[in-house]
Design a protein with these regions (language model features):
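A short alpha-helical cap/connector motif
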Residues: 1-95, 99-123, 128-265
């Protein structure tokens, strides 16, 4: 039984999947070809694992005689996924090695998120397709750009960030890990909660935010903190000093922008 995998993938698999070995899990692979990888995964995860394959080609049903569950359908078809999950229930791992197209990968991930158990993992491989012309890329709507969008979704759990409208993934996706040609999404609704600030007693004369921009004006900041320390007792002076030298005002933002820009070349 033939299986095609890039050699660097196996070290990534081990890092992501090792915690599931020997456990009762439901593992789904999209794109099983001749079935070689299904045998590999059964040997790797152990006999307790429920191994399910998805493929477009009806010939893949032949693999059922080896004890695998095989479903035939298109991974870019939302109705296929709804029918699939209604039959098998929630899963623990999904590995997408299907067609590698943007829509195929995006639909597969999006439909799997709410159908994956807590502490489960969704892995999309061959994500280098997002950079290749034969897959219609580069594109604003590539899978990698969708993955970056999901980073914004995760960070929208922070209370000061405007919530991304109509997105119901922020309370499901706990983390996203990027590897060479592989993206791994961890699902955990219990840990995907909005942040709450835990605050200890803060000195009225000195705020932790005062340290955020002092590196831009070290000499001035040091002079104010030593020579003009007495002025800090005056609320109005303290407010002015903080705005000019310790806050993200216009001057500081420009300096941040220019310094950061050079790292994006």
């Amino acid at each position: 039984h033939v299986s095609l995998k890039y050699d660097t993938y196996f070290q990534t698999y081990e890092e992501i999947f090792s915690k599931y070995v020997g456990k009762e899990i439901t593992f789904v692979e999209v794109g099983v070809l001749h079935g070689g990888s299904l045998f590999m995964w059964r040997e790797y995860f152990g006999e307790k694992a429920r191994i399910i394959g998805i493929d477009l080609h009806p010939a893949a049903k032949e693999l059922e005689k080896h004890g695998f569950e095989i479903y035939i359908g298109s991974q870019s078809d939302i109705n296929f996924w709804k029918n699939f999950f209604s039959k098998i229930g929630k899963i623990d791992i999904l590995l997408d090695d299907g067609g590698h197209g943007n829509v195929q990968q995006i639909v597969t991930l999006s439909e799997a998120i709410h159908n994956t158990n807590d502490d489960g993992t969704i892995v999309i491989e061959d994500t280098h397709a997002s950079y290749l012309k034969k897959f219609g890329n580069p594109s604003k709507y590539s899978f990698m750009n969708y993955s970056k969008y999901l980073i914004d979704v995760i960070n929208s759990r922070f209370s000061d960030i405007k919530v991304i409208e109509n997105n119901n993934f922020k309370n499901k996706i706990y983390s996203i890990s990027f590897y060479e040609s592989i993206v791994a999404i961890k699902i955990n609704s219990k840990k995907s909660i909005e942040t709450t600030l835990l605050k200890n007693n803060e000195n009225e004369m000195f705020k932790v935010t005062d340290l955020r921009t002092t590196d831009h004006f070290p000499k001035i900041s040091n002079y104010i903190d030593t020579k003009l320390k007495a002025l800090h007792k005056l609320p109005i002076i303290r407010k002015i000093v903080r705005y000019l030298f310790y806050s993200h005002n216009f001057i500081v933002k420009i300096k941040h922008y220019l310094k950061s820009k050079k790292y994006f070349k």
